[in-house]
């Protein structure tokens, strides 16, 4: 991992965080951002869907339109891909090309897990769609913070923050979230070098330590 002074001529490192709802991604992203900042490592934090003006507008449509205005599954996967394409070309690739590290809250693995395994859409189609939307730009390392669907549901119920808008994906049935979790586990099984499973039931400091250990072992 290179400092700000060293990174001007080097490609940045791309790190993504994945996992079910309320797995602690936001906390771990913040801790990793602080870790990099303390070492003068230039880093940008972003999210999907979102990360750009257009991406944030698509996020509102895909996550918070409920009832009769909710998007159908086929439209949902295409909207996620549209947000990602804009994100990749306008933010992620330019940052990495400038030697800036990118930490992304969700990326293409979420589309495979949620829309592929969760919704039951064609996996090969999603793989092709992801490849097109990302322009082949994939994370150097992906951390999946793993929780059972039951643990995730309990955290959602007990969390302190209140959502101003209903999140229709978060509020989906337990059976859906069980399929999503299996999707993440299968992705990690197929790509063990890139995708690392970390138990999200551990203390946040322990999880952070494991993340740093994996970063230091994989990214030089």
Regions found by a protein language model. Give the residues of each.
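Pre-Walker A (Motif I) flank of P-loop NTPase domains
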Residues: 10-14
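Conserved lysine of the Walker
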Residues: 25
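NTP-dependent small-molecule kinase module
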Residues: 2-7, 33, 150-220
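ATP-dependent small-molecule kinase phosphotransfer cores
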Residues: 37-134, 210
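Hydrophobic positions on the alpha1 helix immediately C-terminal to the Walker A/P-loop
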Residues: 28
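Hydrophobic anchor at the beta1->P-loop junction of P-loop NTPases
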Residues: 17
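A glycine- and Lys/Arg-enriched "phosphate-lid" helix/loop adjacent to the NTP-binding pocket
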Residues: 111-182
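Walker A (P-loop) phosphate-binding loop of P-loop NTPases
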Residues: 22
């Amino acid at each position: 991992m290179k400092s700000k002074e060293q990174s001007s001529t080097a490609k940045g490192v791309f790190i993504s965080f994945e996992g079910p709802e309320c797995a602690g991604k936001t906390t771990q992203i913040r801790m990793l951002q602080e870790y990099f900042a303390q070492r003068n490592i230039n880093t940008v934090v972003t999210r999907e869907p979102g990360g750009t003006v257009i991406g944030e507008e698509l996020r509102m449509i895909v996550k918070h339109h409920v009832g009769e205005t909710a998007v159908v599954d086929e439209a949902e996967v295409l909207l996620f891909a549209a947000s990602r394409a804009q994100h990749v070309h306008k933010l992620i690739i330019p940052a990495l090309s400038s030697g800036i590290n990118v930490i992304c809250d969700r990326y293409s693995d979420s589309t495979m897990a949620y829309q592929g395994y969760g919704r039951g859409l064609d996996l090969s189609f999603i793989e092709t769609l992801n490849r097109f939307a990302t322009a082949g730009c994939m994370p150097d390392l992906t951390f999946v913070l793993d929780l059972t669907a039951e643990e995730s549901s309990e955290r959602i119920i007990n969390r302190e923050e209140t959502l101003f808008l209903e999140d229709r994906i978060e509020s989906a049935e337990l059976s859906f979230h069980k399929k999503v979790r299996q999707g993440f586990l299968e992705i990690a099984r197929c790509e063990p070098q890139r995708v690392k499973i970390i138990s999200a039931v551990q203390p946040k400091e322990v999880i952070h330590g494991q993340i740093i250990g994996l970063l230091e072992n994989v990214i030089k």
